[in-house]
Amino acid sequence: VLYARYTAKHGLHVPYPGIALRSGSSGGTVRLVQQKLNSLGERLNADGRFGAATAAAVQRFQRRSGLTADGVVGEETWEKMF
């Protein structure tokens, strides 16, 4: 997670963590997604818990990016985001 935070902060590609993030997920990778969404104009509490607000923000990002808006951060959404 530290590597991911460093690379995201410095505009470098962050590799997909290998697991989809969805409602109920938690941890540093969720926090990283929340921080990225906030940098794109969302106003999430970056607490590392993937709840309804994070899912809605992910769906908005997916729609803007031409992806299926399912609220899940899978590999395709991750690659567009990072």
Task: Enumerate the predicted regions with their spans.
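DNA major-groove recognition helix of helix-turn-helix
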Residues: 62, 73
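PDZ domains, with a preference for the canonical peptide-binding region formed by the helix
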Residues: 75-81
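Conserved micro-motifs of the catalytic ATP-binding
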Residues: 65
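Acidic, Ser/Thr/Pro/Gly-enriched interdomain connector segments
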Residues: 2-48
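Conserved hydrophobic/aromatic packing and binding residues within compact polymer-binding modules
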Residues: 37, 58-61
